[in-house]
Amino acid sequence: MDKDRIVGSAKEFAGRAEGAVGDLAGDAQTQASGKAREAAGTVQNLYGQAKDAVREASETAAGYAKDAYDNSGETFRDGSQAIARKVQDNPLGALLVAGGIGFALALLMSRPARRPPPRWRYYG
């Protein structure tokens, strides 16, 4: 529990008590002061709740990230073993696929021939 939640609840309670005293005494200034303190306590309590929610969300996200990181090596290993089995089962097909991928990459990475800039003719 966040400190702001505790302090906010205490301020809210004190504001309610002060407002009740103002109601009993018939003092408008004490009533207004109590309502203001109660509102400030409510706001501080809500702020503490928001901080707690953010802290919980960040801890949960960190836990998910740690789990994903821990399992990523196993997933990579499984994928590598599956590819190795496919290559051993069909080496010619794997060679053709690798050659096709290399050819496609070469086409993507090659630059087109540079054309000379267009010449402008001025008619005067």
UniProtKB/Swiss-Prot annotation:
Q: Which Pfam families match?
A: CsbD
Protein name per Swiss-Prot or TrEMBL: UPF0337 protein blr1496
**Record organism:** Bradyrhizobium diazoefficiens (strain JCM 10833 / BCRC 13528 / IAM 13628 / NBRC 14792 / USDA 110)
Q: Which InterPro entries match?
A: CsbD (IPR008462), UPF0337_stress_rsp (IPR050423), YjbJ_sf (IPR036629)
PANTHER family registered for this protein in UniProt: UPF0337 PROTEIN YJBJ
Similarity remark: Belongs to the UPF0337 (CsbD) family.
UniProt superkingdom? Bacteria
